[in-house]
């Protein structure tokens, strides 16, 4: 069974990874492009940044609950 401390550590690592993705995609240097089966593409960079921003907030709440 995983302890609360181990879960909090995992959440912290996930949060750090999300922050790295925001740094990578948020600066405009790297874009996330989704290629559809029909060959069309869609830029999903803004969605990736928004999703990772939400993840950081969620992981912060989980860490707080696990370490309270």
Task: Locate the predicted segments by residue.
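Short E/K-rich amphipathic alpha-helical oligomerization segments
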Residues: 16-47
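Low-complexity, intrinsically disordered/propeptide-like segments
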Residues: 10, 27, 37-39, 62-65
